[in-house]
């Protein structure tokens, strides 16, 4: 990704075209202040990185914006509207989909069926229709299957459509999780360490997929420990340490930040 391209997308955020704005987000667990007045602004069409040492609060922030944790304080605006993360299914309906650090697929279901499950958040027919199977429900089910097939092709694993998801390679399971998240038609795709456990070749392939998703107009929030991947892929980066924001900006600027080097990158980073 060129510096000019990253700067252009960052300028969008400065022009208040933010898809997601979070301000003053705090979360405490007993005596542990997991998040302290965290704020960030993600522009539409960006890949936005959230990095920091282990225990910095990254996954806690993900869990807050996706309804798994209730924040003690803070406000959110999603796509120009006030947003309150509540139940997980309501978060998906609002337009945020996520993956987890640990893969969470239905192992005995096929790859296609896993993606179809994700698509059901956008269905119009209710439970009675699912049982009675009127023509409208059957048409919708066919549409769901077709869309799921398209998404498997999109992420590059269509040949495994009928395979149980547990039989896929680790990297392909990660791609399947992304396809399932995309099936909800999210405004914001939140990925929690998607490159964890991948080899170098798989990481290069993942980077290409995420760039493709962004270039198709999706917005991505990314937690990732692979600093090289983050700095080469993201348009902007926020760094957390002990639940606080210690730096935010273009990747090149963040890499030179003294507080970031001391807390996370290490003195030997270049």
Where are these regions (language model features)?
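Glycine-rich phosphate-binding loops of nucleotide-dependent enzymes
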Residues: 2-270
């Amino acid at each position: 990704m060129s510096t000019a391209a990253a700067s252009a997308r960052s300028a969008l955020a400065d022009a208040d075209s933010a898809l997601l704005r979070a301000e003053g987000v705090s979360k405490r667990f007993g005596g542990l202040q997991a998040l302290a007045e965290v704020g960030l602004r993600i522009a539409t069409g960006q890949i936005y990185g959230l990095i920091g040492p282990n225990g910095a609060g990254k996954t806690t922030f993900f869990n807050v914006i996706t309804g798994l944790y209730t924040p003690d304080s803070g406000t959110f605006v999603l796509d120009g509207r006030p947003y309150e993360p509540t139940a997980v299914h309501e978060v998906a309906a609002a337009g945020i989909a996520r993956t987890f650090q640990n893969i969470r697929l239905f192992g005995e279901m096929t790859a296609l069926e896993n993606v179809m499950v994700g698509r059901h958040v956008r269905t119009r027919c209710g439970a009675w229709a699912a049982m009675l199977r009127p023509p409208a429900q059957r048409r919708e089910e066919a549409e769901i299957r077709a869309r799921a097939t398209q998404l498997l092709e999109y992420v590059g694993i269509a040949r495994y459509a009928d395979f149980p998801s547990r039989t896929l390679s680790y990297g392909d399971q990660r791609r399947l999780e992304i396809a399932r998240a995309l099936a909800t038609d999210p405004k914001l795709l939140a990925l929690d360490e998607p490159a964890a456990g991948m080899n170098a070749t798989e990481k290069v392939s993942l980077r290409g997929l995420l760039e493709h998703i962004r270039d198709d107009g999706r917005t991505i929030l990314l937690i990732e420990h692979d600093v090289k991947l983050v700095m080469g892929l993201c348009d902007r980066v926020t760094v957390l340490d002990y639940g606080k924001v210690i730096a935010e900006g273009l990747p090149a600027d963040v890499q030179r930040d003294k507080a970031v080097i001391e807390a996370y990158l290490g003195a030997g980073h270049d």
